[in-house]
């Protein structure tokens, strides 16, 4: 596999999470006790006008579609409706093919406590029997690094967007989760859930449709990876929370804006593992978001993985998008040996096993924790070194 080296300069991941409102498009979230969400959505549109694009029943209850302003105002006062939000754009949190040293240093780093790197990656578990859902641009399932373990599941992108990864980001992320060469968990089953188009952009309504599909159809034990996001969005956060409540562990990118991750979604979801990015010298990456909504860090700069241009393609990318699948892979390793573990228990194991206080440039209020998979098969006997009360596994803090 020949990694590409034809790209922008170092630490130049894709755009920040600033979102744009989609004119006339809205997300309507029902109250938890609402019955028959698809039927209710159709009824409300018949009464008030508009069009239903997606009906949500599993991660949350509600629908997304085009609505006239009068309908929006009426729905805000409907007793079945919790809230209405404008649909907005979202995007991936990594990109740009980049030159880098010829080694998958991210894998090398997460199996040892300290530098220097050992030029090897040692693993015990492989994630066999665990399903990882890549909620992204899709996956090039035929890539040799997946060894037939990648399948296509769902496409939420509206229009004529094909059931393929026409961007490359999702294939790269999947490779870091579970590629034979580039992956943390080399035996997982990889599932493509497409919510971003060929440009790497999408809408919250598409993301929620993907989350809703995973919640309804996941083969457990299951992990979901979301190397994407946008400005704070309550419906997006609620969808992730509902999916986690169903038993699926979520690994989510903190974002690439060098600011507080709590202002982004779904990074600000308390129920998920939110991941910041580091460099090869154990520094917080200059682009990485930070703050109390970040749970831990993982390698994210100059990460080599599979790409979509051929079945043997590989490139280097940077971003919190690249850090996040390291954690998703670690979750899969844990679930192989603890298949009945809840997302809270998976989070506690990863959080507690992380290497403490080796990172530089981590702002106050952010956890100085680096992913470590050497203890991935063992529930940590000690409580986490950093306790964040908003996180569900904070009960492990003493």
Predicted regions and their residues:
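C-terminal subdomain of the subtilisin-like protease fold in secreted/lumenal serine endopeptidases
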Residues: 12-17, 53-54, 188-192, 206, ...
């Amino acid at each position: 596999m020949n990694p590409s080296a034809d790209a922008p300069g170092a630490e130049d991941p894709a755009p920040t999470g600033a979102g744009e409102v989609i004119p006339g498009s809205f997300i309507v979230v029902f109250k938890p006790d609402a019955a028959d969400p698809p039927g209710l959505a159709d009824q409300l549109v018949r009464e008030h006008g508009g069009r239903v694009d997606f009906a949500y029943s599993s991660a949350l209850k509600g629908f997304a579609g085009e609505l006239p302003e009068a309908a929006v105002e009426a729905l805000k006062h409907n007793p079945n409706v919790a809230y209405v939000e404008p649909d907005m754009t979202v995007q991936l949190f990594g990109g740009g093919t980049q030159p880098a040293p010829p080694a998958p240093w991210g894998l090398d780093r997460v199996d040892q406590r300290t530098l220097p790197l050992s030029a090897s990656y040692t693993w015990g578990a492989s994630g066999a029997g665990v399903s990882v859902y890549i909620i992204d641009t899709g996956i090039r399932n035929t890539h040799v690094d997946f060894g037939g373990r990648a399948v296509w599941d769902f496409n939420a992108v509206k229009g004529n967007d094909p059931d393929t990864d026409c961007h490359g980001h999702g294939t790269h992320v999947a490779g870091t989760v579970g590629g034979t060469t580039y992956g943390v968990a080399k035996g997982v089953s990889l599932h493509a859930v497409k919510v971003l188009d060929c440009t790497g952009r999408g809408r919250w309504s598409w993301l929620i449709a993907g989350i809703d599909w995973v919640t309804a159809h996941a083969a457990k034990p299951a992990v979901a990876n979301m190397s994407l996001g946008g400005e704070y969005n309550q419906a997006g956060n609620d969808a992730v929370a509902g999916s986690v409540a169903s038993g699926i562990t979520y690994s989510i990118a903190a974002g690439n804006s060098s600011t507080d991750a709590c202002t982004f979604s779904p990074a600000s979801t308390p129920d998920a593992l939110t991941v910041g990015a580091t460099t090869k010298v154990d520094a917080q990456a200059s682009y990485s978001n930070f703050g109390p909504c970040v749970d831990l860090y993982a390698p994210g700069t100059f990460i080599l993985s599979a790409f979509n241009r051929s079945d043997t393609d590989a490139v280097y990318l940077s971003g919190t998008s690249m850090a996040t699948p390291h954690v998703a892979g670690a979750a899969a390793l844990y679930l192989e040996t603890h298949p009945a573990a809840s997302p809270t228990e998976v989070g506690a194991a990863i959080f507690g096993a992380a290497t403490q206080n080796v990172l530089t440039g981590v702002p106050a209020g952010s956890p100085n924790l680096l992913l470590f998979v050497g203890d991935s098969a063992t529930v940590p006997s000690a409580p986490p070194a950093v306790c964040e009360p908003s996180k569900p596994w904070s009960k492990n803090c003493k």
